[in-house]
Amino acid sequence: MGRAVATPEDLKPRLRGVFHQWAFFAALVAIGVLVGIAGTGTARAAAIVYGIALAAMFGASALYHRINWSERPRRWMRRLDHSAIFLMIAGTYTPFCLLVISEPLALIVLAVVWGGAFAAGVINFAWIDAPKWATAVVGIALGWISVIALPQIPVTEAALLAVGGILYTAGALAYALKRPNPFPRVFGYHEVFHVLVVAAAAIQFAAVAVAVSAG
């Protein structure tokens, strides 16, 4: 197993990974909140799946970005970080497929997003040096599959999901284009991406909470 090694502080912005580190601990609390407000056994199961995906995304990102890994483990951590993004997308769909969307559409969406997340993860591990735009495009495409199910989702939850999706998309574009890059030594384009992801996740968490509490 590789070990973390020290590298010059100016190789990455000082806030790299900080926001996702905080978000990871918030996600642990969020799991408990969702399980506590779940109205049924199915809702609790959906809350757990979503909560694990949420914590996994922020946890993998924090581990990857906060530690100065040596080259070999860094490449593996990058794989894990990117794969956790696709896991989060599938995890976010799960409560709505189990609790809100009617069959057979719910089963179709569930199969597509989990199948897509698995396939994207496999490709990610096989193509570690994929350009940033490729990861962004796959994430955006997988995330916006929900538009086919929006008519079945109540207005409040649908609006929250849409706003979160827009923020995720804006973050993916910032990541792919490497801009805006306001303060490269402290808060660069990647931090813009991370902040937008945290904001998007918080908004979509509210949508999941509504669905779980009513489920």
Task: Name each model feature, range by range.
Residues M1-G215:
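Multi-pass alpha-helical transmembrane bundles in non-GPCR membrane proteins
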